[in-house]
Design a protein with these regions (language model features):
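N-terminal leader/auxiliary helical segments
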Residues: 1-100, 105-349
């Protein structure tokens, strides 16, 4: 992933670097939508709808897993196109959400290879998630303390990521339309609306002042599934930080999916690297939205006396929009959330 609070902190920090443009204005107006967008596909890991539908006989893979294992360019292209088809306040909400989603990809694809290395990940081996989640929770504590001077326990997700009914409808409907196209997930709009509203509530349950909630969950998991699954995600008020997870000693690590890619970068190095990647993505996203707006405006001003001239201008505008979209998709890079490698070059996890 990296963890929920690391993504939240990344969003807070990178916002300061963004230029004052159309995208940043939308984020400013809909900050909680942006914060939720920063959680990317992870919101679906906290959504009970998929397990319930499977129990009812509808064989559906978890959308969060599906998105993490699929090429990303088609999703981001459709998200940007659908966002530009919206108008007014709806479009502002969608821009803020997509901007956050871009941040999730930037950090995941940049930092995940290091995390997989130090958690000794092996494809197909059960029990990896417990180690992975514990490692990322340790990073959550370190990053929140470094940048926000507070514990993840003190970050109230219901306040920071809770959307209004209107915002959740816009985001839910947007996801419903795009996921139907990209992942053949033809579910109800209400399911997506519930998923985005449910996430801040569910994650607030993973905060424990005394640690009692975590211990109870551990007992249940041991009894039911034989190992810890979600309990490592519970954050406590008092927690002994393990700063070694940041690799500030710069130990060597390699990409599990392409072992010749070796690095000694720390998590903080990767955090800063992801910022630069993200800012380029947002600049390209902003340019496409501007080109689209100008194109619509010019089209409404045409009349029969300037039809030929208008047609030529329309072609030029289309070329500019295509270039802007290409630039945006280059920034996205079709990079895997897990390996950071491009699906355009070879099949990856």
């Amino acid at each position: 992933m990296p963890g929920l609070y690391t993504h939240y902190t990344f969003g807070r920090e990178v916002y300061k670097q963004l230029e004052n443009n159309l995208v940043k204005n939308a984020i400013r107006e809909h900050r909680t939508v942006y914060n939720l967008g920063m959680q990317g596909p992870d919101i679906f890991f906290y959504f009970p709808g998929f397990p319930l539908l499977n129990r009812l006989g509808r064989k559906i893979s978890n959308l969060g897993t599906r998105m993490h294992h699929s090429p990303v360019n088609p999703f981001f292209m459709e998200m940007l196109k659908e966002t530009c088809r919206l108008k007014g306040r709806q479009q502002q909400v969608a821009i803020a959400y997509l901007a956050g989603f871009c941040g999730h990809l930037s950090l995941d694809s940049t930092a995940h290879p290091m995390i997989y290395h130090f958690t000794e990940y092996k494809e197909g081996v059960k029990g990896n998630f417990e180690i992975h989640a514990t490692y990322e929770t340790d990073i959550d504590y370190c990053i929140a303390q470094k940048y926000l001077k507070k514990s993840p326990y003190n970050i109230k997700t219901k306040k920071e990521m809770g959307m209004t009914k209107y915002e959740s409808e816009v985001v839910g409907d947007l996801l419903c339309k795009v996921c139907a196209k990209c992942y053949d997930m033809n579910q109800w709009k209400s399911m997506y609306r519930f998923a985005v509203r449910n996430f801040p509530v569910m994650t607030s349950l993973f905060q424990s002042k005394t640690g009692r909630r975590k211990r109870i969950l551990q007992r249940i998991e041991k009894l039911v599934i034989g190992h810890y699954q979600f309990s490592p995600l519970v954050v406590e008020k008092k927690y002994k930080m393990n700063s070694r997870v940041l690799n500030e000693s710069h130990h060597r690590w390699e990409n599990y999916w392409k072992k010749e890619l070796v690095s000694c970068k720390s998590f903080l190095d990767l955090f800063d690297e992801a910022r630069q990647v993200y800012c380029c993505m947002i600049d390209a996203m902003n340019e496409y939205i501007l080109q689209k707006k100008y194109s619509v405006h010019d089209g409404s001003m045409r009349n029969k006396y300037v039809k030929h001239k208008g047609s030529m201008q329309s072609k030029k505008k289309q070329i500019k929009m295509n270039r802007a979209m290409d630039e945006f998709l280059r920034g996205v890079g079709n990079r895997s959330y897990r390996s950071g490698l491009s699906y355009d070059e070879f099949y990856t996890g």
